[in-house]
Swiss-Prot record:
SUPFAM superfamilies: IlvD/EDD N-terminal domain-like, LeuD/IlvD-like. Binds 1 [2Fe-2S] cluster per subunit. This cluster acts as a Lewis acid cofactor. This is Dihydroxy-acid dehydratase. Pfam families: ILV_EDD_C (PF24877), ILVD_EDD_N (PF00920). [2Fe-2S] cluster binds at C122, C195. The active site is at S517. Mg(2+) binds at D81, D123, K124, E491. The keyword Hydrolase does not apply. Functions in the biosynthesis of branched-chain amino acids. Catalyzes the dehydration of (2R,3R)-2,3-dihydroxy-3-methylpentanoate (2,3-dihydroxy-3-methylvalerate) into 2-oxo-3-methylpentanoate (2-oxo-3-methylvalerate) and of (2R)-2,3-dihydroxy-3-methylbutanoate (2,3-dihydroxyisovalerate) into 2-oxo-3-methylbutanoate (2-oxoisovalerate), the penultimate precursor to L-isoleucine and L-valine, respectively. Keywords: 2Fe-2S, Amino-acid biosynthesis, Branched-chain amino acid biosynthesis, Iron, Iron-sulfur, Lyase, Magnesium, Metal-binding. Homodimer. Its cofactor is [2Fe-2S] cluster; Mg(2+).
Amino acid sequence: MPPYRSRTTTHGRNMAGARGLWRATGMKDEDFGKPIIAVVNSFTQFVPGHVHLKDLGQLVAREIESAGGVAKEFNTIAVDDGIAMGHDGMLYSLPSRELIADSVEYMVNAHCADAMVCISNCDKITPGMLMAALRLNIPVVFVSGGPMEAGKVVWEDSVKKLDLVDAMVAAADDHYTDEQVKAIERSACPTCGSCSGMFTANSMNCLTEALGLSLPGNGSTLATHADRKRLFVEAGHLIVDLARRYYEQDDESVLPRSIATFSAFENAMTLDIAMGGSTNTVLHLLAAAQEAEIDFTMADIDRLSRRVPVLCKVAPAVSSVHMEDVHHAGGIMGILGQLDNAGLLTTSIPTVHSETLAKALDHWDVTRTNSEMVHKFYSAAPGGVPTQVAFSQERRFDKVDTDREKGVIHSKEHAFSQDGGLAVLYGNLAEDGCIVKTAGVDDSILKFSGPARIFESQDSAVLGILNGKIKPGDIVLIRYEGPRGGPGMQEMLYPTSYLKSKGLGKACALITDGRFSGGSSGLSIGHVSPEAAEGGTIGLVREGDIIDIDIPNRKIHLAVDDATLAERRAEQDAAGWKPAEERKRKISTALKAYAAMATSAARGAVRKLPD
């Protein structure tokens, strides 16, 4: 049996000094020999998705100790992508994922913790902790802070649901008065929690359920609802049980790499495609798979995207549906249940809470079970009161939405589309692939052809859109915004939001080697690989070049002959692969270090040491 890692610091005469320090943290004689569980929190007052986490780490810690473990809490950083958006702060967002993963590794290995409970929530925090968990491969349970309630505003004599993107779009739309914009701003983000749509944060928290590393309801139970407290309480007890099973019973099946297998990654990606998750999830799943030493690639995502239908449409794809509505329809277990019915999942694999996913679905899918407890759990409703306090309300819907024909979650037979919600496109513009969230693309522009309007940065693209330089039929092309070129692979939420505000959301396309917020919609194609900074064809496109986009056939093509491209490549090799116009960006040493090691989006933008 593997020895408890913590005994490296708690046992033996030579560890008297270390034990003295442990005692100074509150440990007593009877604690030495118990599993030491790291409570990996991410509380910060900068981020609404994390502002309520301050006391939740200690809630988990108390449950760990009541179950016979020793809990030690520490914090990671957490960047709010919405606040960092639209300025140089966004350069730090993706690199923060690596810092989070490293900080968890540093703390857990330096102090020889035996297991972890990861309390995450927003965009890069869940992926960073997931990467660390698979890197360390010690028992882990994920429990996130939960989604915020959707905003609501009275608009033209009716109540309209809102989220962060609505505020951005309205602010750039001259049809809205200052007073109307202010009303939307004040109502868009009413509570603590991750932004209310199927954006990156919620997408990733949902995927932890499919990977088998979190409890049912983790992705959809509102941050404000009292039911969410149960997830934290159960996580504290569960992690002690998992630690004992591994260290005392030699049960390797509880380890994250035994749970998050290739099949689990397929399940997670299948879920992502079916629910129209954020394109950022592709980046993060690829990165996590590499940490787990799993050969899960863009080719696998492409394969899955061709057979998985869209079973759930959530904001930004449908403005009236938010995470509270997904939960009301049975949450992630409800979507997984329909995917299983369609034969699209591997359900023989384990989870942290169940012997197999199949058994979990039998208990937790509201269309399969008559359990009063399960139906009550998924009837949790928004409270409708602005608050930053977790578990502060107990409102419920009268009954759960089990309509799989016209409800929030559809069966395969009644799918929104038999073609998946995410697609990988290939062609001479993206030899290693690029990603589009098809769930947010209008059917009328699934095939699109137009002239490229070149911008060497997100900033110049924003100015071009706001100043009326983009016309219907144009393709906005933003380059040198990839992992190396940015550096940091900025999100392009402002350009997509501004196109929408100008009435161009269904009349233009946007292509970039950067990435998109989970709040982006429209014909937005990102993660173009190779990126411009590493010699990708996107760096050879010139103003007015025609680009053909064919989503049904998964193709993207720059209509320039090979000989001309070869000439341009020779010229660019001589000039250097850098933006044609100077950018006023302060690139710190930290960002330069990230850029020096960053790989392409097709590899998850993970770091790779130079040969």
